[in-house]
């Protein structure tokens, strides 16, 4: 609903330019049209007069009055007020919200979507777990946030590529192989010859058992069969990594998360991309050798110190394949790249940005963008849950899904701003009460379904066309408040995408559900008067549609019965 007001204001500015009140070279400033915190200040407010006054040296309140007088007439605007130093407050007629409610039902699943992304390609990387163990709750938060970001970007007109980067190279993989080999040889944690830095979870025993049994793993494009040879570390490596990839994929599928691309870190070495990237950096003149090591002049690009790329023993530091990987994204045509990571990766961001800038191939500063999430604390019975027998040291994503549900787990892991620490209360997530936010929102959806079912059972035929034409019958405040809340949805979708903050969708849905439940408790719906009843059912159906659209962005279901 902001766009028509912005257009109206721009027309007013053009009128003042035409009559000489404003200089002809005065361009419409980057003004804000926003909803005030309280409706007593109007439905929308703008700071345009104050911005124009700075450019022209005019009194902002007087300029606001002049601009208001120049605005074209709009049937949607009931009155306009000047407030404070020059804010212009718009009070809308209820008809504007009634029309927006009708738009919801006309646009159906597309309501709230826009084309601002212009079909440009954006790569969204998330989860990207090491294939060394089960997915933990931190990976779950990354999956929920990343998947919701991808859905948000699609809703804003972007062509989204979902990507999972497997860190299947390095010391951690070597530790995995030694752990499985030790288990296959009959050793267990605590034994004298149990390897240092080995993984102790029960899942290692499961892998070893499957390996010794000669099991096969059915991956997407191949079948991997164990050789059962406990001395063949290459075979154990191949089997164990793919066993855990398969397990992680199983958990992600249960979490309704899928990817377009699975990228293996090992492929960067196999295809020579790491060496190629290092050579490009050497050729760019932004490296030097010291102490037998190769250094990147990362301080030239905003890092706090230069970084070692290749150690004196010839091995690469961990951020070098990260540069090669992100270079591959750029070469694949990603105009925009977003990487979702745990906050513990913060230290690597500057060096990756520095490496990409040092390539001098036109990658813009700040590419890729990063979304960092903080840790998750799991609580049950008022106490922190720290251990899982299967993982040997942390709560897994599978644990949460099995103890609560996919819907509850996704909601709770999205519900806070990514850079805020999150407490996952298992007891609350299992409650069927209004204290549980996902239940509260889904119950609003189910309530509308129940209303429609009751109407059918009572032979109260619903005429949507009549309902749309009769929304002006709903003159009470709770109905208007519900329509206003519905109308906010497209703005929230756009803002959440711009800020890369999917929790804003969850917050909005809770507020919409509250407005609906308030309306439901204060307004008899299935009344005798058919015109009034159709209008109320139309408002209820519009609410249900927005709830469905928003829950879909979160990857949360819409049960018709609770």
From Swiss-Prot:
<dbReference type="GO" id="GO:0004814">
    <property type="term" value="F:arginine-tRNA ligase activity"/>
</dbReference>
<dbReference type="InterPro" id="IPR014729">
    <property type="entry name" value="Rossmann-like_a/b/a_fold"/>
</dbReference>
<dbReference type="Pfam" id="PF03485">
    <property type="entry name" value="Arg_tRNA_synt_N"/>
</dbReference>
<dbReference type="InterPro" id="IPR008909">
    <property type="entry name" value="DALR_anticod-bd"/>
</dbReference>
<keyword id="KW-0547">Nucleotide-binding</keyword>
<keyword id="KW-0648">Protein biosynthesis</keyword>
<dbReference type="GO" id="GO:0006420">
    <property type="term" value="P:arginyl-tRNA aminoacylation"/>
</dbReference>
<dbReference type="InterPro" id="IPR036695">
    <property type="entry name" value="Arg-tRNA-synth_N_sf"/>
</dbReference>
<dbReference type="Pfam" id="PF05746">
    <property type="entry name" value="DALR_1"/>
</dbReference>
<keyword id="KW-0030">Aminoacyl-tRNA synthetase</keyword>
<feature type="short sequence motif" description="'HIGH' region">
    <location>
        <begin position="129"/>
        <end position="139"/>
    </location>
</feature>
<dbReference type="InterPro" id="IPR001278">
    <property type="entry name" value="Arg-tRNA-ligase"/>
</dbReference>
<dbReference type="GO" id="GO:0005737">
    <property type="term" value="C:cytoplasm"/>
</dbReference>
<dbReference type="GO" id="GO:0005524">
    <property type="term" value="F:ATP binding"/>
</dbReference>
<dbReference type="Pfam" id="PF00750">
    <property type="entry name" value="tRNA-synt_1d"/>
</dbReference>
<keyword id="KW-0436">Ligase</keyword>
<keyword id="KW-0067">ATP-binding</keyword>
<dbReference type="InterPro" id="IPR005148">
    <property type="entry name" value="Arg-tRNA-synth_N"/>
</dbReference>
<dbReference type="InterPro" id="IPR035684">
    <property type="entry name" value="ArgRS_core"/>
</dbReference>
<comment type="similarity">
    <text>Belongs to the class-I aminoacyl-tRNA synthetase family.</text>
</comment>
<dbReference type="InterPro" id="IPR009080">
    <property type="entry name" value="tRNAsynth_Ia_anticodon-bd"/>
</dbReference>
<dbReference type="InterPro" id="IPR001412">
    <property type="entry name" value="aa-tRNA-synth_I_CS"/>
</dbReference>
<keyword id="KW-0963">Cytoplasm</keyword>
<comment type="subunit">
    <text>Monomer.</text>
</comment>
<protein>
    <recommendedName>
        <fullName>Arginine--tRNA ligase</fullName>
        <ecNumber>6.1.1.19</ecNumber>
    </recommendedName>
</protein>
């Amino acid at each position: 609903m902001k766009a028509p007001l912005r257009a109206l204001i721009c027309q007013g500015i053009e009128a003042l330019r035409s009559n000489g009140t404003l200089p002809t070279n005065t361009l419409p400033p980057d003004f804000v049209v926003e909803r005030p915190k309280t409706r007593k200040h109007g439905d929308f407010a703008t700071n345009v007069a104050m911005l124009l006054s700075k450019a022209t040296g005019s009194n902002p309140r007087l300029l606001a009055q002049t601009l208001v007088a120049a605005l074209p007439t709009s049937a949607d605007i009931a009155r306009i007020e000047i407030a404070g130093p020059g804010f212009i407050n718009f009070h809308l007629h209820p008809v504007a919200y009634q029309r927006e409610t009708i738009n919801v039902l006309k646009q159906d699943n597309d309501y709230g979507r826009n084309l601002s992304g212009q079909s440009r390609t954006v790569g969204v990387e998330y989860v990207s777990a090491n294939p060394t163990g089960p997915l933990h709750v931190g990976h779950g938060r990354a999956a929920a946030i990343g998947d919701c970001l991808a859905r948000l970007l699609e809703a804003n007109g972007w062509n989204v590529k979902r990507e999972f980067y497997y860190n299947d190279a390095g010391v951690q993989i070597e530790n995995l192989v030694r752990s499985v080999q030790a288990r296959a040889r009959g050793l267990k944690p605590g034994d004298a010859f149990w390897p240092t830095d080995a993984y102790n979870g029960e899942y290692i025993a499961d892998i070893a058992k499957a390996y010794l049994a000669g099991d096969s793993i059915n991956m997407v494009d191949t079948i991997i069969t164990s050789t059962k040879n406990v001395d063949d570390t290459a075979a154990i490596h191949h089997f164990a990594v793919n066993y855990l990839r398969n397990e992680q994929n199983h958990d992600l599928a249960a979490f309704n998360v899928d990817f377009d691309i699975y990228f293996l870190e090992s492929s960067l070495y196999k295809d020579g991309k790491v060496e190629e990237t290092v050579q490009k950096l050497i050729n760019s003149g932004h490296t030097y050798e010291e102490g037998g090591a190769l250094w990147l002049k990362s301080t030239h690009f905003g890092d706090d110190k230069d970084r070692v790329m290749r150690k004196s023993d010839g091995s690469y530091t961990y951020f070098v394949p990260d540069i090669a990987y992100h270079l591959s994204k750029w070469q694949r045509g990603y105009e925009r790249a977003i990487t979702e990571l745990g906050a513990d990766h913060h230290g690597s961001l500057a060096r990756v940005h520095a490496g990409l800038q040092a390539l001098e191939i036109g990658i813009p500063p700040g590419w890729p963008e990063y979304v960092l999430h903080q840790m998750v604390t799991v609580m049950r019975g008022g106490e922190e849950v720290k251990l899982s027998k299967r993982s040997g040291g942390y709560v897994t994503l599978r644990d949460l899904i099995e103890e609560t549900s996919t819907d509850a787990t996704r909601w709770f892991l999205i519900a806070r701003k990514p850079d805020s620490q999150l407490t996952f209360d298992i007891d609350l997530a299992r409650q069927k009460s209004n204290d549980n936010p996902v239940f509260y929102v889904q119950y609003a959806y189910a309530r509308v379904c129940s209303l429609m079912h009751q109407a059918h059972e009572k032979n109260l035929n619903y005429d949507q066309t009549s309902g749309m034409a009769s929304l002006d019958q709903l003159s009470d405040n709770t109905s208007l408040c519900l329509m206003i809340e519905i109308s906010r949805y497209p703005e929230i979708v756009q803002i959440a995408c711009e800020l890369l903050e999917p929790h804003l969708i969850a917050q909005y849905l809770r507020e919409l559900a509250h407005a609906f439940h308030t309306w439901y408790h204060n307004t008899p719906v299935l009344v005798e008067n058919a015109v009034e009843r159709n209008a109320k059912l139309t408002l209820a159906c519009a609410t249900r549609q927005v709830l469905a659209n928003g829950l879909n962005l979160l990857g949360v279901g819409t049960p018709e019965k609770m």
